Amino acid sequence: MRSEKLIFHIDVNSAFLSWSALERLRGQPGSLDLRTVPSAVGGDEESRHGVVLAKSTPAKKYGITTGEPLASARRKCPGLIVVKPDFAVYVEQSNRLRALLRRYTDAVIPYSIDEAWAEFENFGRMYGEPEAFANKLRCEIKETLGFTVNIGISTNRLLAKMAGDFKKPDLVHTLFPEEVPGKLWNLPVEHLLFAGKSTCKRLK
């Protein structure tokens, strides 16, 4: 059992798409769940400047990527359902997530609208085994708020975020300092946090 301070990184899976899907289901009970079909949240298609802001897991199977022009995404998947973003809804859902996290710790540090760190002092004494508690928290978020998250666990924010980015969706991963050689060193350099294209090119 780990007794030191631990940090969780909580990252909402396909946040804008998930939150748009929930809002649609709330307004139209029984309607199609956007998360179960090829769908995307995107900008104004008529201006020809619309891009994919978020996409569903089924949309990913068509090779659709975040930031891709919607016209390109539609060529890959002609049946793609596109909905406009609703940032008021996204802020509301983000606040709901942070409020839930604050039931367990006051140290909730936002990283973006769909990501946050939660810091826990004397973790083992308070919460027991990290992965067991993280899975309990993950399930509570899904059952209470209606969307899934990845949770990364470590002793610092950087490693916790990198852990959360391993495999998605709806999973818990650890990346403690002693696990770095086994879990991180064999990954492509692109997996390094904050490593841009030029940095990756030099490192290769």
Region locations from a protein language model:
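Gly/Gly-Pro- and Ser/Thr-rich, intrinsically disordered tail segments characteristic of DNA damage-repair
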Residues: M1-K204
